[in-house]
């Protein structure tokens, strides 16, 4: 089909417009052969009937794309494609009187903001626009085109439908991909985009389109950076996310030179994702036609890894009907001199045909719209409407009209580098038909498993493939079983908790059977009093813990398990049972254990459900430990007890420690006052009544309204908020502590110096100004204590110190010492006794420590067996060892290094190096014999024999040392390498202790001389091994690797065959590379270029004319 036939309405006349009948091409294109004859068809007469002004009209088509910023898009040669289309169109227009078409190549920036600007600029210059390519600019371009009356063909928009002035070239990419995914039932997909704006926007537009069709797009991620590392990171995000069947690659195809897709596929092969568990679908191939055929793809032929990874790729691309291809059409156009003869067709992207088709499709819509409008100028909307009905000759086949273009699914066979057609998409039904070749998945597998078909059914809500009614019933069953299980667990838990609370060692519910009262025959008021400890001031008790002592005459004291207890009654007298919330709250409070916090023992319940009926109704009380000295208020009121500052500070420090412990456990006392602080028989103060408000709230008992006298310790912010007063705050406890400190320091009631009634004091504290606070003179306490009190009285809660800060400040007053009157004398005696015991223990420990140091030092100088013999005073006889392995090493160029270094630097060098060696030999069965200068000597097989293992131990140690030396650097000359040479030899020797002063364990024999000779004839970074050692290593068969060095002249031995030890199988540590010795160079020194300039001057002064030497 040719342009002339579709301009008149789409009738086909192959004899009229053949490929040889085009008009001369525009400048830049080769000349076109002249048309020999003209034959008019009746539909063409429509153009001839148009007014002459219309026939001579010029229609400018803009081709917008990232031609300048994207080299792969530029390979589509949009200039040649658009000019070829215009040339053919103008040839038809010249023959049949149609309008003339001109094309303008417009660059589109690769960045999204620039793309929008390019669209806006292009719409003012053209009558029709092919583009944009960036999906982010598609919707704005359509709106601007409607306003400007310009027709659009946005072939790069993945989800665009024909609407307004927009007419797509092909079926939207989302529809084609959806059809493919539905055919294979792959619902869960992920999108990986290139980092450029164009592809990122395309990925988001495609994901939106797929989600609109009901598919669960699991992930949309970008490759950043756009290399192999970015590809690995993107694929790891795919692995870590929800299950995925297919990965859509929104980027240039690797078949066109896309490096991002190459990296992604190679990374997938490395990570094992190209094994058939995932399928990879390229996105950009939906916009052009890749043709199957026998031609090899060079990009696959040149890389076996990519060819293997590409086996997991299914390529969906436009289908050229009748077996044609873009490459064949390019070849025919070049043969007819419509394209330059020197154009390399292999370098032209198949996108050439898409650009050509877009221009032709737009021209067809213009022609049909003008005919329908009687020859007048038409709007973009009219052109778009007629494009849908136009049928034009595409570059490789018919295009447009009622028939949608089709797609073909291409695949490789994993071994070759060719593409085969497997399925063809039916454009009308949306189904694939087999093209004869089955899809080949990696490793011959079946590919990713299918998802439930409900994902592709618009009338079904998909829940993992299960029917909604079944899901709903299952959900109800699970919820019902969960509720039943929760109820059963709750019931069992509370039942078990109740059993534990009423019986056993941890019970907390106490009855009349558990507590013995002082006057069991009295009335109810004699059983449990109101719980105020104020009345204790009238008592005189010498020892309430003794049954034979004088007992107080009050019924709020009882005997529980042999100890006296105190009962604090709950308000009211109608408590039938203890609520579960009360039990839980009390269990948490009872867990508070501290020396300065009174211990709660249980909840007493008389009458009701608590046990045998008591006179009256049920009585509920908190049972706590009883303190013999009563409350702090009682103690302060007893004037016969003298309280000096030592005594007062001891009490206050106990109080601070107790409140601090409660605050650390998140407990605000809320009712802190001097009568809630009790003192035991040892004058240790303890905080009690804590958590009482929480227990009342759990038991749903309203507290009794506090009197003004009880509110003297309450912070001002709590006085203003009754609800907050019942609960208490941490800052409120600090304020109450400050009032108690005033009581203790002044030994008077709160605010006693103000001569005001409690009601007046509470009113002034609640409603300042002025501030109402106690007054303490500086002669009653240290100034630091008074300042701390004033900080605790601060009006603003946030200005008061925390209990940790209060504790630190108060400790600093007495320098951290705790004083107690009664314990003072006992403490002195105990301290003297304990000091004496500690002194003896310390001296004994020091003696033992020094002995261990001496033994450790001796064993470092001599073998343990020899050291023990010397300590016992027994003589150490020389011992003959049949077979040992010796190690010798020294530093190459040590004399040169010494000449370039200060003496202290030489010492530091040897100390650092030998410390490194000593750390290594600790991991091997070897014995360090000695070090002389830069020489290091180690032996294995003595003084403890180890069979033939000595050779392997020395060899392993030598490899470890050589590896460590490769990274060792001198502190004063880090740029100068430290090279060592190592010699190993196995054989017999004699070992013994020589001398009485500074005895040394020495080795004697020919083996020692030979090992030393092996070292001296070695090379830097080499392990020189004698034949005897190699034979033992071979017999051990532990994988040691040796190389033959050749015959070496050994001092006193003559020429012998020697070897290099180069490694061991499984030894993965790096070994430094031995330096290459130039002919005539010494193997014992340092090269001139390795010596720093500043050190070289010093060396010249020390050794003129010589720069290396041993």
From Swiss-Prot:
GO terms for biological process: cGMP biosynthetic process; intracellular signal transduction; receptor guanylyl cyclase signaling pathway; visual perception. It is a single-pass type I membrane protein. Residues 57-467 are extracellular. It is found in: Photoreceptor outer segment membrane; Endoplasmic reticulum membrane. Keywords: Cell projection, cGMP biosynthesis, Disulfide bond, Endoplasmic reticulum, Glycoprotein, GTP-binding, Lyase, Membrane, Nucleotide-binding, Sensory transduction, Signal, Transmembrane, Transmembrane helix, Vision. Residues 493-1110 are cytoplasmic. Glycans are attached at residue 302. Its EC number is 4.6.1.2. Expressed in the retina in rod outer segment. Activated by GUCA1A when free calcium ions concentration is low, and inhibited by GUCA1A when free calcium ions concentration is high. Negatively regulated by RD3; inhibits the basal and GUCA1A-stimulated guanylate cyclase activity. Residues 493-813 form the Protein kinase domain. SUPFAM superfamilies: Nucleotide cyclase, Periplasmic binding protein-like I, Protein kinase-like (PK-like). The chain crosses the membrane at residues 468-492. Residues 1-56 form the signal peptide. Catalyzes the synthesis of cyclic GMP (cGMP) in rods and cones of photoreceptors. Plays an essential role in phototransduction, by mediating cGMP replenishment. May also participate in the trafficking of membrane-asociated proteins to the photoreceptor outer segment membrane. Belongs to the adenylyl cyclase class-4/guanylyl cyclase family. Homodimer; requires homodimerization for guanylyl cyclase activity. Interacts (via C-terminus) with RD3 (via C-terminus); promotes the exit of GUCY2D from the endoplasmic reticulum and its trafficking to the photoreceptor outer segments. Interaction with RD3 negatively regulates GUCY2D guanylate cyclase activity. This is Retinal guanylyl cyclase 1.
């Amino acid at each position: 089909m040719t342009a002339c036939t579709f301009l008149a309405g789409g009738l086909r006349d192959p004899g009229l417009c053949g490929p040889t009948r085009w008009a001369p091409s525009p400048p830049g294109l080769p000349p076109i052969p002249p048309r020999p004859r003209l034959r008019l068809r009746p539909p063409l007469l429509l153009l001839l009937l148009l007014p002459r002004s219309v026939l001579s009209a010029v229609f400018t088509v803009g081709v917008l794309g990232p031609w300048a910023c994207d080299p792969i898009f530029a390979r589509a040669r949009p200039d040649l494609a658009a000019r070829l289309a215009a040339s053919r169109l103008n040839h038809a227009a010249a023959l049949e009187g149609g309008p003339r078409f001109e094309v303008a190549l417009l660059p589109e920036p690769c960045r999204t903001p620039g793309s929008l600007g390019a669209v806006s600029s292009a719409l003012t210059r053209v009558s029709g626009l092919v583009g944009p390519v960036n999906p982010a600019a598609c919707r704005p371009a359509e709106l601007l085109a409607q306003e400007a009356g310009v027709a659009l063909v946005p072939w790069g928009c993945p989800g665009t439908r024909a609407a307004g002035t927009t007419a797509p070239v092909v079926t939207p990419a989302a529809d084609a991909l959806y059809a493919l995914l539905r055919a294979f039932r792959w619902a869960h997909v992920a999108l990986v985009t290139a980092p450029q704006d164009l592809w990122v926007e395309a990925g988001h537009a495609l994901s939106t389109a797929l989600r609109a069709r009901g598919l669960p797009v699991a992930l949309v991620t970008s490759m950043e950076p756009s290399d192999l590392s970015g590809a690995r990171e993107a694929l790891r995000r795919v692995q870590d996310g929800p299950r995925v069947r297919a990965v859509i690659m929104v980027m240039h195809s690797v078949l066109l030179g896309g490096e991002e897709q190459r990296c992604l596929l190679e990374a997938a092969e490395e990570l094992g994702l190209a094994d058939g568990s995932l399928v990879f679908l390229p996105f950009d191939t939906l916009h052009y036609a890749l043709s199957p055929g026998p031609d090899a793809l060079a990009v696959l032929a040149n890389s076996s890894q990519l060819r293997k990874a590409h086996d997991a790729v299914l390529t969906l691309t436009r289908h050229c009907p009748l077996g044609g291809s873009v490459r064949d059409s390019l070849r025919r156009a070049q043969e007819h001199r419509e394209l330059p003869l020197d154009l390399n067709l292999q370098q032209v992207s198949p996108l050439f045909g898409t650009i050509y088709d877009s221009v032709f499709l737009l021209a067809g819509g213009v022609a049909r719209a003008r005919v329908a409008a009687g020859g007048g100028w038409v709007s973009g909307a009219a052109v778009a409407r007629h494009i849908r009905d136009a049928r034009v000759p595409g570059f490789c086949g018919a295009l447009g009209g009622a028939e949608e273009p089709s797609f073909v699914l291409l695949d490789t066979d994993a071994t070759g580098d060719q593409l085969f057609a497997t399925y063809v998409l039916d454009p009308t039904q949306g189904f694939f038909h087999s093209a004869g070749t089955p899809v080949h998945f990696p490793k011959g597998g079946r590919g990713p498993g299918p998802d439930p078909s409900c994902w592709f059914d618009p009338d079904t809500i998909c829940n993992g493939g299960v029917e909604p009614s079944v899901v709903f019933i299952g959900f109800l069953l699970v919820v019902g079983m969960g509720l039943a299980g929760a109820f059963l667990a709750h019931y069992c838990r509370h039942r078990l908790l109740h059993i534990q609370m009423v019986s056993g060692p941890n019970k907390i519910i106490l009855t009349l059977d558990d507590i013995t009262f002082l006057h069991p025959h009295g009335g109810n008021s004699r059983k449990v009093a109101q719980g105020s400890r104020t009345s204790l001031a009238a008592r005189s008790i010498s020892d309430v813990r003794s049954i034979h002592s004088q007992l107080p005459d009050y019924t709020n004291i009882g005997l529980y398990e042999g100890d006296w207890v105190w009962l604090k009654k709950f308000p009211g007298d109608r408590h039938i049972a203890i609520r579960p919330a009360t039990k839980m709250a009390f269990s948490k409070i009872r867990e508070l254990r501290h020396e300065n916090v009174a211990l709660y023992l249980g909840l007493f319940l008389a009458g009701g459900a608590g046990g045998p009926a008591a006179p009256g109704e049920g009585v509920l009380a908190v049972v706590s430990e009883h303190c013999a000295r009563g409350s702090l208020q009682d103690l302060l009121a007893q004037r016969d007890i003298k309280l000096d500052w030592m005594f007062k500070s001891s009490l206050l420090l106990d109080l601070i420690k107790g409140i601090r412990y409660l605050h650390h456990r998140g407990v605000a006392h809320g009712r802190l006052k001097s009568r809630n602080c009790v003192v035991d028989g040892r004058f240790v103060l303890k905080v009690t009544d804590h958590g009482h408000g929480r227990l009342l709230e759990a038991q749903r008992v309203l507290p009794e309204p506090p009197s003004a006298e009880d509110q003297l310790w309450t912070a001002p912010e709590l006085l203003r908020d009754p609800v907050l007063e019942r609960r208490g705050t941490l800052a409120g406890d600090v304020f109450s502590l400050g009032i108690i400190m005033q009581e203790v320091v002044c030994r008077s009631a709160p605010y006693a110096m103000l001569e005001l009634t409690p009601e007046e004091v509470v009113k002034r504290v609640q409603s300042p100004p002025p501030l109402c606070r106690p007054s303490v003179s500086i002669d009653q306490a240290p100034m630091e204590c008074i300042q701390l009190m004033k900080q605790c009285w601060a009006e603003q809660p946030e200005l008061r110190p925390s209990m940790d800060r209060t504790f630190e400040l108060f400790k600093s007053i007495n320098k951290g010492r705790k004083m107690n009157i009664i314990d003072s004398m006992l403490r002195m005696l105990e301290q003297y006794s304990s000091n004496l015991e500690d002194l003896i223990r310390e001296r004994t420990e020091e003696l033992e420590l020094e002995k261990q140091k001496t033994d450790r030092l001796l064993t470092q100088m001599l073998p343990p067996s020899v050291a023990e013999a010397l300590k016992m005073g027994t003589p150490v006889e020389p011992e003959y060892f049949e077979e040992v392995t010796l190690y010798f090493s020294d530093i190459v160029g040590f004399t040169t290094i010494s000449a370039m270094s200060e003496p202290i630097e030489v010492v530091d060098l040897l100390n650092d190096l030998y410390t490194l060696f000593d750390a290594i030999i600790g991991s091997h069965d070897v014995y360090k014999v000695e070090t002389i200068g830069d020489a290091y000597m180690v032996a294995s097989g003595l003084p403890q024999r180890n069979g033939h293992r000595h050779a392997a131990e020395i060899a392993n140690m030598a490899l470890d040392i050589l590896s460590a030396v490769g990274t060792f650097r001198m502190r004063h000359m880090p740029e100068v390498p430290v090279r060592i040479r190592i010699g190993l030899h196995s054989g017999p020797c004699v070992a013994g202790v020589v001398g009485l002063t500074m005895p040394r364990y020495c080795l004697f024999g020919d083996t020692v001389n030979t090992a030393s000779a092996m070292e001296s004839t070695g090379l830097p970074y080499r392990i020189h091994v004698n034949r005897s050692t190699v034979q033992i290593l071979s017999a051990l068969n532990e994988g040691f690797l040796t190389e033959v060095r050749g015959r070496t002249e050994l001092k006193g031995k003559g020429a012998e065959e020697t070897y290099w030890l180069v490694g061991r199988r499984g030894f993965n540590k790096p070994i430094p590379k031995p330096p290459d010795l130039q002919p005539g160079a010494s193997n014992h020194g340092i090269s001139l270029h390795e010596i720093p300039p500043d050190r070289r001057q010093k060396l010249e002064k020390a050794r003129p004319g010589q720069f290396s030497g041993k």
